[in-house]
Amino acid sequence: MFLIASVEHKGAAMAEAPIKRALISVTDKTGIVEFAQTLTKEFGVEVISTGGTAKILEEAGVPVVPIESYTGFPEMMDGRVKTLHPRVHGGLLCRRDNPGHVADAENNGIGMIDLVCVNLYEFEKTVADPSVTLENAIEHIDIGGPSMLRSAAKNNDFVTVVVDPADYGRVLDEMRVHDGATTRASRQQLALKVFKTTAAYDGAIAAYLSGVVEAEQSKFPETLLVKATKEQDLRYGENPQQSAAFYKMPGAPAHSLANAQQLQGKPLSYNNLLDTDAAWAAVREFDDPSVIILKHQNPCGSATAENVVEAYDRAFACDPVSAFGGIIAVNREVPLEFVEHFADINKQFVEVLIAPSFTGEALERLSKRTNLRVLATGGIDRSRELEMRTVDGGLLVQDLDHADEAADSFEVVTKRQPTPEELNDLVFAWKVCKTVKSNAILVAKDQAGIGMGPGQPNRVDAALLACERAEAACERMGIDSKNLVAASDAFFPFRDNVDTLAAHGVTAIIQPGGSVRDDESIAACDEYGIAMVFTGKRHFRH
């Protein structure tokens, strides 16, 4: 029979709560042996433990009271029932300043438990495996762990609860300062972490089961549970007067921005993250070697070529002025030749360079530009399905938009068919135009986005702006401004868009179609000898 620690626990809610007895049961064994050894050797704490945790502690020489000895009941039902017992939860929930609670504990042989150290079955890791079965997932739903955590956290006036191995040192340091006790402020903070953890844990379970039970409906469930973990505080938000932080979503694709490794450079800012995400989303639309140079969410330079060095040359030439302070995204490993070329032709400031990987020689050369942020994603992943945006008091969720229309699905609506060269450029322009803010027109030639008309309230202004920039780019690149192609993210409401494009050397157009005046635009194309194709899919980007 264990002694009931009652007298020393009586009294009002304590600013300092002594730790005499601890219950330890963890899935993540990181640092647990050292933590338990210090509790027992330095502070004389009695340790109760369960299953695998008890075994590890005993092997390390830590005196352990097995949970079944403490409760008087064996672990049952394959371990499903081991800590769900009054001697456990009574010892956690008893208010030491309540005479009735203390009397109940004494009359029922319940001792006080002053510290709970528990972390949970790795449910999210389990269900992240595509081959996981429902049965296996359910077996990884922790019951006893959350129950103990919640009991201890509820009674944080008297009980210290630790759910994160990162807090072991903090608790021990405080016990050294306070003669084996913890402070109320620390216990409250640790309890808050517990409730955040258990809420997120239950949310992950609900999200998984929603996907299994609700099937297709689960994409947009009645209740959307979003768990995000703070990765870092940011220096400021979109502007210096705005504070900001970056959070990582659960199940982030392996090669996403959230999982990218920063290899060098200053910390990423809020605007860096926004623009890098847009640039990475744009460049991963392409299968061939491609480079996107992006500024303020718009691709001011874009090109596809036989290799990334040539693609960078042509993307930079599209608009060198706008490239200043931009983001460069590459969809291939970056070799030394790229970096040398990049350093030679681009003396301007670049915020971020992102690619799947970099050769060692490339990184060595890049290290000379200490302020340049270099990110490696480890690969290209197109598995992301949804995107979210906030509105005042709400959250918008939609399918991610992909420019995945194949050329053989296009409908040629004009008398003239596009040439093979025009068709290749149309496919390229269509993918780039999708990433431009609406209303958007993108003029291209030879697999380069030489003219961009982004974010205009009316489409004809977007067309005019794109054409003017294309003419300037052609002059700068030493190529003629004829035989250009144009992409529009949405249909032409009037034929004036065709008139504008035709006047500036455009010979082929790609757009969704669907306007009540499509016939007028088609007739205008036929007048100018322009080939036009409809994709049947719009790509607004707001």
Short names for language-model regions:
Residues F2-Y70:
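N-terminal glycine-/serine-/threonine-rich phosphate-binding loop
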Residues A15-I24, L115-Y121, Y201-G203, G211-H542:
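ATP-dependent carboxylate/acyl-activation modules
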Residues V33-F43, E124-I141, S147, A279-D288, ...:
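Short, hydrophobic/aliphatic alpha-helical segments
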Residues T40-K41, E58, D142, A153, ...:
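Anion (oxyanion) recognition and catalysis
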Residues G52-F123:
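Glycine-rich nucleotide/cofactor/substrate-binding loop typically near the N-terminus or early
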Residues M148, N155-V171:
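Mobile "lid/hinge" segments at catalytic clefts and subdomain interfaces of large enzymes
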Residues P165-A166, R170-L224, L234:
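Non-catalytic interaction/clamp surfaces of large macromolecular machines
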